Structure formats: structure tokens, C-alpha cells
Amino acid sequence: MIAATYTKKPGALSRAVACCALLLALVLLAACERSPPGASEVPVALLHPPLTPLFVDLEERTFRYFWDTSDRPNALVPDRFPYNEPFSSIAAVGFGLTAYAIGVERGWITRQQARDRSLTTLRFFATAPQGPEPSGKAGHNGFFYHFLQLDSGTRYASWVEVSSVDTALLLAGVLFAQTYYDRDDPAEAEIRILADAIYARVDWPWLQVRKPLIGMGWLPESGFIPHDWQGYNEAMLVYILALGSPTHPIGDDAWVAWTRNYDHAWGQFQQQEYLGFGPLFGHQYSHVWIDFRGIRDDYMRRRGLDYFENSRRATIAQRNYAIANPMRWKGYGENVWGLTASDGPLAASLDYDGQSREFRHYSARGAGIADVFDDGTIAPTAAVASLPFAPEIVMPAVEEMQHRYGDEIYGKYGFLDAFNPSFDYDMPLKTGRIVPELGWVASDYIGIDQGPIVAMIANYRDGFVWDVMRRNPYIRRGLLRAGFQGGWLEEGPQPRKGARP
């Protein structure tokens, strides 16, 4: 187990690496700030300063969240920790399946340990009871409930829905495990078979109530949720997986319908022109597993960029928004920024700076072309998970947040979920605590915020998760059916790079 306090290690080499990284970051940052509206002019290929010791430490701590908390008979990952509500997030399980292999490649656990934990996970989901009954089931028609009881693995409560997007995040981890564990070994062969069965069972057309769009979910008490996934957001992964299905695929017209309203979200915000979605998780989740560099669908071909560059611009725009700080929140600046879905202090309207301001507990927060909700709450995952897109602004931000707030926000499993320097009111809180001179700080780590941290650091280092998923035939098929062309899709499946035993 790693220590609870991060300390920079002395030595000429570490100082030299850190100095080089900082120098490069400053040069690239200056170039970034000179970018004309609608462009981020620094070539992405140049933006690769080496990881500093903090990122190495953060990657391991965040991996440990998944490894430590899933050590149970069904290997389910809790939605959050140490909050004592006993439920698992199926999306967090998908991130966990990805994190275990990262732990192998980094030398923190053995391949056998990761294989066995992954096999336990897949055995559970392959055999978990499904059906329309309101209790005692883990899902229906191949989809799974958003939250499951940690012990029984069945639906957590009557308000929990069968979720298309959370099932997709779980499946991304399942397919990652299927592709990573590729050896001639009985246990690894079983992982591949179980992954196929879990993915093939999902009846995607069942949730196409208003075809060709895919609905958000279903509840046994009230039926289908009256909302569909359309326009740019985190559900890009849902459509790619549904198009790639070998058993229950959706039609090609679904991607056309999904992108039909993109123009409403396209525009300029904070000196960047891009396809907007306020919270940064919408620009990150699908990118955890899919390498969008150099591949484009029809819409992005017409716009002249790819989704990776789009996420880069969204990241830069969020930082620019924090520098502008139109709502005058405390702490915001060039190296303290990041709005996404996260915990917050509480749900209330309170006086701040002579104005009534809305604060929220857990909520999506963001700033973009069409939507802004900002209550002063910063989530470190928002910046860290954008590391591959814009390292020249992410690295200084992560270093500054850890340096400025230290152990109050950085602990056993890395960054606590969020903090709000502006919220220092003396009142009862649902979660978190008030720290003098700092403000509100979350008390929990949240699985779906931890997952992008560990995965995107790995992708930044050497493209590990992306390289594995490039070899998955279902991902490739889904992208091709969505009309993606170019880049690695034109190269054909690549052989696997060397791996640890």
C-alpha cells in the first residue's frame, strides 16, 4: 500500500525532468494562449512533456481505489468510498476492469491477479439474474441497472433504472478485458468467452422506442424513460457499441440521427470553436477506450477536425473560462479549473458576493457553448482526464491544485472528488466538510471520476488502453458502421505490443 502523503522525491534527475516539463509547458501554454478563435494552433504531436512524479503517484493511488475496494466475492466496485451506502456503479466496474490491466503493465499487480479479479467480475455479470421483475434482478434484456447491491448484485432501489449509458461504460471495460487477456490460458480463454456472451446478450433495439435513437433507460414500475440520446455527449460510446453488436445491432440510420442536432451545439466559446457540451466528462468518457485521433465521421470531416481535437478545444475553453471567472468565484485561475459531474456542498440558494447563487450537491457542472452551470465547485478529475488532449495546461493545473491544497484534497486514493473554495458557510452538509481557509472539500472518491484519471494517464504515457481497444473487432465494426474513416482504421488490426507476464 502506498503512503497517504505525496512527497516529491529529491534528486537531480527528478528535478531535471520536472524543470524540462515545466519549461515545455510554459512555451506551449504561451502558444496556446495566442491561438486565434476557433483553433488550438499547437500541433498535438508536440504536446508530450514527460509525466512528473505527481502523475506517477496519482496513477497508482487511483488504481488502488479499484483494486482495494473490489476485493469481494463478486468483485463489484462501489460507486464511492468511504461513503457507507452499499451499492456498486456498473460504470465504475467498467473502469475497474480497465484499471486492473493498467496495474499489470505498471508492475503493481501480477497478470494472474488481474486475470482472476477480471474473471470473477465477468462470471458475475454473465450469470447475474435478468428479467422484468422490479427486484431481485441485475438487469433486463442484456442491459444492467445503474446501481447494484454490493452484496447480492441485484437492483439497489426502486429509483434505480436500467441504464443504456452505464451499461455501455461497463461493456467498454468488458471488451477491454476480452482483448487484453489474449493468451492461450484456460482462465484468459474463459474471460474472452464470457465477454462475448455479456456483450452479445444486449438487445439494443429494445431501447429504440423512438427509432432510430436509443433511449436512456427503463424502469419496471413505469416503463421506458421518455428521453433519448441525441446530440454530442457521453453517449457516443452507446451508439458505437450498439452499431458493433454481432447479435442485436441497430441500423446505420441511428448515427445519422444521433448527429443530426450537432449544429445546435457547434459554436465559439472562450476563444475556441468546437462541438460543445458543458461538463468535461462528455468530452472524455468515450475517449477513455477509443482513440479518436485521426479518424472522423461525416460530421467531423465537414468540420475539418476529429473528436480528439474537439475535446482539446473544450478543455482549453474551460481553462479560459476559469481565467475569465465571470461569476467571481474564489480560487479560479489559469491553474485551478475543471467543471464536470461531481459532488458539491449542498442544494441551496445562498447569498454570495451580494447575489443569490444556486449551489448543488451531486450535479453536472460545466461551461460551454449552450450550457453553463457553475457554483464554484472544482473537480480535479475534469483536468486530469484531459491530460492527453492538452498536457501543457493540465500538468500545471494538477501540480498547482495538489501544491496549493495538499492533503486536504489529496489522500489515499488520489484526489478527493471535488472542492469549493467559495463555499465556507456554517450550515449542515450532506457530505464533505468545511476546511478553514480552503472552503468545502468532498469526503468521497467516486468511481466514475477515478476511472478516467487512471486510464487517461495511461493513455497519455503510451496509448495503452487505446492500443488494446484498436484490436477489438466490435469497436472497429461500430466505428466503421458509424462512418468513421482514416487513421488507424485504415491500417487494419495491429499486433499487440509487449506485455508483462
Task: Kindly label every feature range from the protein language model.
Residues L28-A31:
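C-terminal motif of bacterial Sec signal peptides marking the signal peptidase cleavage site
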Residues E41-P501:
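Ser/Thr/Asn(+Pro)-rich, low-complexity disordered segments
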Residues M1-L13:
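N-terminal secretory signal peptides that target proteins for export/translocation
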Residues S14-L24:
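Sec-dependent N-terminal signal peptides
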Residues L13-S14, I225:
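Composition-driven detection of intrinsically disordered, low-complexity segments
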Residues E33-S35:
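Bacterial signal peptide processing site
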